Amino acid sequence: MDHLNEATQGKEHSEMSNNVSDPKGPPAKIARLEQNGSPLGRGRLGSTGGKMQGVPLKHSGHLMKTNLRKGTMLPVFCVVEHYENAIEYDCKEEHAEFVLVRKDMLFNQLIEMALLSLGYSHSSAAQAKGLIQVGKWNPVPLSYVTDAPDATVADMLQDVYHVVTLKIQLHSCPKLEDLPPEQWSHTTVRNALKDLLKDMNQSSLAKECPLSQSMISSIVNSTYYANVSAAKCQEFGRWYKHFKKTKDMMVEMDSLSELSQQGANHVNFGQQPVPGNTAEQPPSPAQLSHGSQPSVRTPLPNLHPGLVSTPISPQLVNQQLVMAQLLNQQYAVNRLLAQQSLNQQYLNHPPPVSRSMNKPLEQQVSTNTEVSSEIYQWVRDELKRAGISQAVFARVAFNRTQGLLSEILRKEEDPKTASQSLLVNLRAMQNFLQLPEAERDRIYQDERERSLNAASAMGPAPLLSTPPSRPPQVKTATLATERNGKPENNTMNINASIYDEIQQEMKRAKVSQALFAKVAATKSQGWLCELLRWKEDPSPENRTLWENLSMIRRFLSLPQPERDAIYEQESNAVHHHGDRPPHIIHVPAEQIQQQQQQQQQQQQQQQPPPPPPQPQPQPQAGPRLPPRQPTVASSAESDEENRQKTRPRTKISVEALGILQSFIQDVGLYPDEEAIQTLSAQLDLPKYTIIKFFQNQRYYLKHHGKLKDNSGLEVDVAEYKDEELLKDLEESVQDKNANTLFSVKLEEELSVEGSTDVNADLKD
């Protein structure tokens, strides 16, 4: 009876192999179910065919087909073919199975997710190649079906899933570093990055690998997953192979050094002087051999199991000792260099991990692996205690920007389910917060001084004092009202409609996002952009969001003439600071302060009498301006804002050009709306400036065969001519996001706003 069952299974296996290898292609999925009585390969996978007996397959298939349009999953028939290597295509084993995949999953991730669902590892899934076969057609690679990076499984297989076979070719390659660089793809790069990010953060990885930090984040988060060039994948594959080989070599050197130290101890034990020898007289080679032979041959209680039990010549022993010392020296130098590169992550401050050296090993392991769910509250408490800005804390704690820290605090994801990149950042913040309070304060002070020195050395010297119309009394008064303003917040009408009011106010007053964000909430344009993008429901439990919206509500509650006067005042201050002559950049700080005092006195003397609606003295003008942080807390942000004031909205700085060129190198010249949104918030530039830059680069590539060389100088997109702009991407981006405020559909309004800003700059 068992023999008959085996014969039946062998017959089914041969029929399945014939169907799979038939060039005409397999029949429809429903017909295949009716012929075999069970999904192909079920018997070989341990599933019995008896479970399907008595079930009308036509009826179940019909129900499955009718219910799939309402569900979120699609069945895909997969045939996995194992090969010994990529050159010899001798099929080793076949594995056929149905896999349920999500409809909203990206189509270019179908192979990887199918293999993961079948129980294969990430490394195996990364090395696989897939072909898709529809009906009796010839199988083709998935990349031939569509090149749209955002195409989903439902878009491609919704109507043909019952006649589709996904053929996956899996090559036997034990490790990613053994994979040839020519076979590296987007999937292998992403899995390799995920593996590397378990031991280091993105910034330290970007310093070593050929990918930039923004590109690493995009690949890991699948943002630009399909836009990585094949040449970049191969370059990363070559680097990864060299990196893993070097790392394995370091591990071997470490183990060899430990072994050599133990071996040296045992050799010294065997080289005890024989009677007649003195300590001053070194033993002769014959005596060394004579003295060491009995001790090595006789089993020692503490002899290392890896040591050989046969006699070793003195020359070989000396060579091994010299080699072990050399390896130890090289390893010590490498560790020293690695420690120096690690310190660069923390802006030349000692790494936070060093504080746990005196702790037991169990505590070190727990602090390195577990992140408390209270980390977000700890960060907020630290910001309040030290009176520092998010920009300063983000730089010294985990070497990131203020925007990323604000996004992390806004979402508050559970560390247990967080992504690997977020977990690295949370662990870095937690390690930093476990430093002594005095040491943290010293690091904050060093960072403030460093940012001040860098600002005075790099660009136009920022005005450290506030404009004369904003005395310190206004700040203290408004801060007091903010701290004691809980009843005021409760009486305010703060709901989801405040986002529409912000947009209407910017349209009415014709002010930019940067200007409104500064006067209403003392924030940057990127912060306001993210605020209006997500439009979270205001709630007092989300304290940070509630306080920021309360400041905006207080500002919007002011009379319209007062708001317009504040806009005008801030705009004049921006133009006044931006029109300073370039020769003042290298003037000593004492002369700059004297000039500032003279300018303030002149402005106070020449200032006309205030208009009738504002006869009150200046201390009562507190509600007009939003509360600010203390001057010490926001020194780094004020420096950044002052540097941004000096640059018109159409100018791209050298640093921003470097980021844009890195983006072009990694992604290309055709950014989507999300990429434009990200670059605009990251570089604090309007969208029309970003778009015109890419249009000009595409024009030069099309008509001149190469990208425009800016030679390390600032770029002003207002100087571009209309014929130098290739506008083949704007319409598609506008149609895709026609209903959002921050879509490229507003490019015309932004360009008009940008031209008015430029004209105002020229007039001033």
From Swiss-Prot:
Cross-link (Glycyl lysine isopeptide (Lys-Gly) (interchain with G-Cter in SUMO)): 745
Gene Ontology molecular function: chromatin binding; DNA binding; DNA-binding transcription factor activity; DNA-binding transcription factor binding
Post-translational modification: Sumoylated. Sumoylation promotes cleavage by caspases.
Gene giving rise to this polypeptide: Satb1
Assigned keywords, A-Z: Acetylation, Chromatin regulator, Chromosomal rearrangement, DNA-binding, Homeobox, Isopeptide bond, Nucleus, Phosphoprotein, Repeat, Repressor, Transcription, Transcription regulation, Ubl conjugation
UniProt-annotated stretches for the region Disordered: 1-56, 266-307, 450-474, 591-650
Stretches assigned to the CUTL domain: 175-248
Motif (Protein interaction): 139-143
Biased composition (Low complexity): 593-606
Name listed for the protein in its UniProt record: DNA-binding protein SATB1
Record localization: Nucleus; Nucleus, PML body
Ranges for domain CMP: 71-172
Sequence positions bearing N6-acetyllysine: 136
Sequence segments annotated as region (Nuclear matrix targeting sequence (NMTS)): 224-278
Gly residues bias locations: 43-52
Free-text disruption phenotype from the record: Mice are small in size, have disproportionately small thymi and spleens, and die at 3 weeks of age. Multiple defects in T-cell development are observed, including interrupted thymocytes differentiation and abnormal T-cell transcriptome. RNAi-mediated knockdown in neural stem/progenitor cells in the adult subventricular zone impairs early neuronal differentiation.
Binding annotation for DNA: 390, 400-410, 425
Record field: compositional bias (Pro residues): 607-629
The organism of origin for this protein: Mus musculus (Mouse)
Tissue: Expressed in the subventricular zone, rostral migratory stream and in the olfactory bulb (at protein level). Mainly expressed in thymus, spleen, and lymph nodes with a lower level observed in the brain.
Positions occupied by motif Nuclear localization signal: 20-40
Known partners and oligomeric status: Interacts with PCAF. Interacts with sumoylated PML and HDAC1 Tat via the CMP domain. Also interacts with DYNLT3 and POLR2J2. Binds to EP300. Homodimer. Part of the nuclear protein complex gamma-globin promoter and enhancer binding factor (gamma-PE) composed at least of SATB1 and HOXB2. Interaction with CtBP1 when not acetylated stabilizes attachment to DNA and promotes transcription repression. Interacts with CUX1 (via DNA-binding domains); the interaction inhibits the attachment of both proteins to DNA.
Record-stated family: Belongs to the CUT homeobox family.
Modified residues (Phosphoserine): 185, 638
Induction of its expression: Up-regulated during adult neuronal stem cell differentiation.
Residues flagged as site, Cleavage: 254-255
